[in-house]
Amino acid sequence: MMAAPVMADWRAALPEVRGRIGFDVPLGPVTWFRVGGPAEVMFRPADIEDLSRFLAALAPEVPVLPIGAASNLIVRDGGIAGVVVRLVRGFADIEVQPDGIVAGAAALDATIAEHAAAAGLTGLEFLSGIPGSLGGAVAMNAGAYGAEIRDVLDWAEIVGRDGTVARYAAGDLALTYRHARLPEGGIVVRARLHARPGEAAAIAARMADIRASREATQPVRARTGGSTFRNPEGDKAWRLIDEAGCRGLIHGGAQVSEKHCNFLINLGEATAADIEGLGETVRRRVRERTGVELIWEIRRVGLPCRGAA
């Protein structure tokens, strides 16, 4: 369901910015699934100040959706109304400190892990196994290989929908499994992760193990969006999906991965509706087989294509 009706001429009254604004920008090319309709408006802010001023001046009834690497996202075929804020170069800085790293929201998780390793810092190796960027990782308390963001987060800087910039301690965000309680409409722009000095060879070995594990068990070279469903407490989503007979299941141009069945794949010509429809079929079959209601981990945003059922 979309936000409240927006004034018809809002696009003509956009604030002046130092970044880039585009209209009806296709989102498929920037998502890992390579599907989805256009953003009514795409704003790529130059930096935090540019984003803050834009949001402060933007009519409050205009919906705003932030995206980063779009690695854990299905954009529906009808696109996204309002403004999509895409954080790119001005938000990708990484500063190595003696006991941690401060990084912009657009910094890739794997790149942060590499910077930490190069500085002899341990505790962030798990980030090398998480696709996407830091902003999304904080927003969903991403995790893998026995660790998650709440284990290492010191603070996050967030720009509110009204343009205010505030720093929140990790405890203020109530981080739980694949969830963070962000301020309404807030956009994570920077965060600090703590680490500790470690032995270079051990750090390198741990990261090599994570990369090898991903390569062996996940469809890392496919058009996918990472883990589709959250793991139910005490179980694994992939096991339930397999038990329900969904490994390799095809719907339109989308398929449940044969390699890891908690991953959905765009076989090449899938629509967002194909991928989301396949996910819903998997949820139904798992529910009928096991009684467990799988919860989406991948975010699904936007409108269905006009004329779609």
Curated annotation (Swiss-Prot):
List of catalytic residues:
178, 227 (proton donor), 297
Q: Which cofactor does it need?
A: FAD
**Where is the protein situated, by its record's location annotation?**
Cytoplasm
What enzyme category does the UniProt record give? oxidoreductase
Reaction catalysed by this enzyme = UDP-N-acetyl-alpha-D-muramate + NADP(+) = UDP-N-acetyl-3-O-(1-carboxyvinyl)-alpha-D-glucosamine + NADPH + H(+)
Q: What is its EC number?
A: 1.3.1.98
Q: Which Gene3D superfamilies match?
A: 3.30.465.10, UDP-N-acetylenolpyruvoylglucosamine reductase, C-terminal domain, Uridine Diphospho-n-acetylenolpyruvylglucosamine Reductase, domain 2
Q: Which terms in the Gene Ontology molecular function aspect does this entry carry?
A: FAD binding; UDP-N-acetylmuramate dehydrogenase activity
Tell me which Gene Ontology terms the entry assigns under biological process. cell division; cell wall organization; peptidoglycan biosynthetic process; regulation of cell shape
Keywords from the named record = Cell cycle, Cell division, Cell shape, Cell wall biogenesis/degradation, Cytoplasm, FAD, Flavoprotein, NADP, Oxidoreductase, Peptidoglycan synthesis
The entry's family comment says: Belongs to the MurB family.
Query: What is this protein's function per UniProt?
Result: Cell wall formation.
Q: PANTHER family attached here?
A: UDP-N-ACETYLENOLPYRUVOYLGLUCOSAMINE REDUCTASE (PTHR21071:SF4)
Q: What is this protein called?
A: UDP-N-acetylenolpyruvoylglucosamine reductase
Record organism: Acidiphilium cryptum (strain JF-5)
Gene coding for it = murB
